[in-house]
């Protein structure tokens, strides 16, 4: 009798936490963020290369 009450209480707590949890994990959102980081890195790398070329031209090389 006591064991069934404890088991019921644990089950009730778990179901309450499951119902009240935050938004579920979305793998596509993580994939989109990774793509944005790659895009930003490519844009940044191109800008760094352009600045390096401009500095070389300014030095007369």
UniProtKB/Swiss-Prot annotation:
The modification Glycine amide is found at residue 60. Cecropins have lytic and antibacterial activity against several Gram-positive and Gram-negative bacteria. It is found in: Secreted. Residues 23-24 form a propeptide. This is Bactericidin B-5P. GO terms for cellular component: extracellular region. Keywords: Amidation, Antibiotic, Antimicrobial, Immunity, Innate immunity, Secreted, Signal. Residues 1-22 form the signal peptide. It comes from Manduca sexta (Tobacco hawkmoth). Belongs to the cecropin family. One of its GO terms (biological process) is defense response to Gram-positive bacterium. It comes from the Eukaryota.
């Amino acid at each position: 009798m006591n064991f069934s009450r404890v088991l019921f209480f644990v089950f009730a707590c778990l179901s309450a936490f499951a119902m009240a949890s935050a938004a579920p994990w979305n793998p596509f959102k993580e994939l989109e963020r990774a793509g944005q980081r790659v895009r930003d890195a490519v844009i940044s790398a191109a800008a760094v290369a352009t600045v390096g070329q401009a500095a070389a031209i300014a030095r007369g090389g």
